């Protein structure tokens, strides 16, 4: 299966999962809006996922997959034994980490959201909810490991589907038990139930793929030692990346309602980021690992350039579209219950600011696996350390004048700086070879985006009353029609300019 086709299949499954995620966020936003309770709930929801990105999806996956592929070249049994050792070690490590976090949760929340400390009830509620949700870390991390195993053998569907379980659990559990216990507690408990179901589901998929492995505790194994040594820089790198979020969150905790606003905005701009960037990044790492192991440089360069072209082709129009339509999108998705029109405006502003960095976020997800596929975990760490300095300074500089928008703008500026460093280091180290035609390719896409934006802006201007109709069906139909017309204009123009060739997917 080609990179593009694999990416499209995974992107489609990610799209479905993100739709369910949006429904879940819509449900939570209608209950809490940007109230203090909403801020506490968003922190409790984010905390385990933040550490998951550091330990599981960040450091572990980037180091585990290349070694697992090496073992698979020897035999399936060798790969399964390696998986068993890593699974056991990860489980025991996470149990210790969760126990420590339960003890030091007040101190942890003080670091993540120092602005809450002056508001005793808000601070105590956040600590209480985080103590309920943090055990989800072990389940979601094991799910990520099992997903990495399946991704290594090009079985991407199960892991892409697993987030749907979380969204469905949160909604159903809260609807059933919301009348008997506090909504904040029912949502927090539903996270743990979802985590258990996700692990069970992934285990079933791994067994069906005949990749079942024994539970082995063996820290002296040379492959496990290699994993742990390589995980050092990778964990720091992933941790530093997440530290960007910690810092942004810490700063925003001093602005009432900003944590909730940024969380709701994050959910919408993460929609294309996950569908495009994460989907292709997930596929790229195992693909790149294999071609580098076989020393096939020509294939590696072809994969790199195809991925960059696809990333540009999809991220640039998404950026233009999101910026123009951020307000009606937010209105349709969130504005109900306690979520006010002012919340809609604030969230839309944050979405537009985040969207400015969308191409950089997506292209970074395409370039970063190039280093990990070569076994280089130190360069991404250096790049991330530089980026975090930019992110922190931008957030502090822009927060006073632009409030929550300043934090989102600072994040986008840091994303472009990060991409610039990734490009610079990868080309200097001869790991990336950009084809000469990509500059013209990018210019043509920008021309297509400009024409698309003009058409969308005109539709928005002349049919504004329908985009904000009191009837949901009319609003959704109008927004959907506008997006479809915009997509048709973009790809139609792209075809005329020979940006895309529908026989080969990308030219």
UniProtKB/Swiss-Prot annotation:
Keywords associated with the record:
Cell inner membrane, Cell membrane, Cell shape, Cell wall biogenesis/degradation, Membrane, Peptidoglycan synthesis, Transmembrane, Transmembrane helix, Transport
Primary location group? membrane
This protein's membrane topology, according to the annotation, is: Multi-pass membrane protein
Superkingdom of source: Bacteria
GO MF: lipid-linked peptidoglycan transporter activity
Keyword Transmembrane helix annotated = yes
Q: What pathway does the UniProt record associate with this protein?
A: Cell wall biogenesis; peptidoglycan biosynthesis
Which GO BP terms sit in this record? cell wall organization; lipid translocation; peptidoglycan biosynthetic process; regulation of cell shape
Q: Which cellular component appears as one GO term in the record? A: plasma membrane
A Pfam match is MurJ
Residues passing through the membrane, by range: 3-23, 54-74, 92-112, 132-152, 156-176, 185-205, 268-288, 310-330, 351-371, 379-399, 405-425, 438-458, 472-492
**Where found?**
Cell inner membrane
Q: Which InterPro entries match?
A: Lipid_II_flippase_MurJ/MviN, MurJ
- What biological function has been recorded for the protein in this entry? Involved in peptidoglycan biosynthesis. Transports lipid-linked peptidoglycan precursors from the inner to the outer leaflet of the cytoplasmic membrane.
What family does this belong to? Belongs to the MurJ/MviN family.
Query: Could you tell me what this protein is called?
Result: Probable lipid II flippase MurJ
Species of the source: Rickettsia prowazekii (strain Madrid E)
């Amino acid at each position: 299966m080609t990179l593009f086709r694999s990416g499209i299949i995974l992107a489609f499954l990610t799209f479905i999962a993100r739709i369910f995620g949006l429904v879940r966020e819509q449900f939570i936003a209608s209950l809490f809006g940007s109230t203090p309770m909403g801020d506490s709930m968003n922190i409790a929801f984010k905390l385990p996922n933040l550490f998951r990105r550091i330990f599981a999806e960040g450091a572990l996956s980037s180091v585990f997959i290349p070694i697992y592929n090496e073992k698979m070249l020897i035999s399936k049994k060798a790969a399964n034994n390696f998986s068993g050792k890593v699974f056991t070690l990860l489980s025991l490590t996470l149990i210790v980490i969760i126990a420590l976090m339960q003890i030091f949760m007040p101190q942890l929340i003080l670091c993540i959201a120092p602005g809450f400390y002056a508001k005793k009830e808000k601070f105590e509620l956040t600590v209480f909810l985080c103590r309920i949700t943090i055990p989800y870390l072990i389940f979601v991390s094991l799910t990520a490991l099992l997903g990495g195993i399946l991704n290594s053998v090009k079985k991407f569907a199960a892991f892409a589907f697993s987030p749907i379980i979380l969204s469905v659990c949160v909604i159903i559990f809260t609807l059933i038990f919301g009348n008997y216990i506090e909504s904040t507690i029912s949502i927090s408990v539903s996270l743990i139930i979802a985590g258990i179901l996700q692990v069970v589901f992934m285990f079933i998929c791994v067994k069906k793929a005949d990749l079942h492995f024994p539970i082995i505790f063996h820290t002296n194994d040379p492959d496990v030692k290699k994993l742990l040594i390589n995980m050092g820089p990778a964990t720091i790198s992933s941790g530093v990346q997440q530290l960007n979020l910690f810092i942004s969150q810490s700063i925003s905790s001093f602005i009432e309602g900003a944590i909730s606003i940024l969380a709701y905005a994050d959910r919408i701009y993460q929609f294309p980021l996950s569908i495009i960037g994460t989907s292709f990044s997930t596929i790229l790492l195992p693909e790149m690992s294999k071609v580098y192991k076989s020393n096939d440089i020509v294939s590696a360069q072809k994969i790199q350039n195809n991925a960059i072209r696809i990333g540009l082709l999809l991220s640039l129009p998404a950026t233009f579209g999101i910026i123009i339509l951020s307000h009606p999108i937010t209105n349709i998705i969130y504005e109900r219950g306690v979520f006010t029109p002012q919340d809609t405006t604030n969230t839309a502003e944050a979405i537009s600011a985040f969207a400015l960095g969308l191409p950089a976020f997506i292209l970074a997800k395409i370039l970063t696996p190039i280093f990990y596929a070569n076994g280089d975990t130190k360069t991404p760490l250096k790049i991330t350390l530089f980026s975090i300095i930019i992110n922190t300074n931008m957030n502090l500089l822009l927060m006073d004048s632009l409030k929550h928008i300043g934090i989102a703008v600072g994040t986008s500026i840091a994303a472009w700086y990060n991409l610039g460093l990734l490009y610079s280091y990868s080309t200097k180290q001869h790991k990336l070879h950009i084809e000469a035609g990509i500059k013209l390719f990018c210019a043509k896409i920008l021309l297509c985006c400009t024409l698309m934006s003009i058409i969308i802006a005109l539709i928005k201007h002349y049919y504004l009353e329908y985009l904000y109709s009191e009837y949901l069906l009319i609003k959704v139909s109008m927004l959907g029609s506008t997006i479809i017309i915009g997509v048709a204009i973009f790809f139609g123009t792209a075809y005329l300019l020979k940006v895309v060739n529908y026989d080969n997917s990308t030219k």
